[in-house]
Amino acid sequence: MRRYVCVFFFLLAGLLARGQEAYTDLVRQGMDALAMDSLSQAEASFRAAMSKEPTHHGNSELFRYLGRIKERQEKNSEALEMYTSGLNLSPNNVELRLDRAALYYRMGNQARAASDYSDVIDLQSTNMEALQMRAHIRASMHDYKGARADYETMLVAEPHNESALVGLVLVNDRSGRPREAMEQISALISVYPRRALFYAIRGGMEQRRKQYEQALADLTQAIELEPSCADYYVSRATLYLEMRKRRLARADTQMAVRLGADPREMASLLK
């Protein structure tokens, strides 16, 4: 009897090993297909792997790959289902949750995106992507206190994090602390005098204050430092229009189009 039991377990181990090998082969085939942009073939391989080993610990990652495939196919609802299925298997998978949060955000569901980013922060308190995106969402929903807290958390972990530095300036500017915001952006410019973005941000702040000459000087400086950035030409064109300098605005929109801006948007700007 003992001999038959041993044979049974030997056969079972062999079957499990072959099943694992087949699963691995299918996953490898799927990854190879992804590398060749054969999305349908990759999807078929990943689904076959999960059918063969429905309880495999790696299936949550396969759902993540399937979600990304669906996103590339512009099937966002199906992508969301894939990410959610993966999280049902592995709720603490940070990368999966970040992917779903980003998709929620692109689909316009900021509340669910913020919820997923909060879950990531509960798992990793200094996850920069989650903190930055939650701060951005909070600011867009006028929760400036919450946004400021997230940016400050980022700066404790990374004191020179540019996204947090800029985000804090913009939050202060929008939340009734304009003097502090202007002092902060000017301090950044004094430390990083060759950073075009900072001049563009200060120029925008000055424009909102109707300090047109200062704004023009800063936006022109941004263009001189980074002449290939279409956004800076668009910003200066908007300023020129407020200053009733339509010819100069038109010249900047034409340059922006040459640098990749949407011609229809530029035409609409000049109407």
Where are these regions (language model features)?
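Register position in tetratricopeptide repeats
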Residues: 35-36, 69-72, 106-107, 140-141, ...
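Helix-start (N-cap) detector for alpha-helical repeat units in TPR-like alpha-solenoids
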Residues: 23-24, 57-61, 94-95, 128-129, ...
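Canonical tetratricopeptide repeat
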Residues: 61-65, 99, 133, 167, ...
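Structural marker of alpha-solenoid helical repeat scaffolds
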Residues: 52-55, 89, 123, 157, ...
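N-terminal leader/linker segments that initiate helical-solenoid repeat arrays
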Residues: 17-65, 72, 271
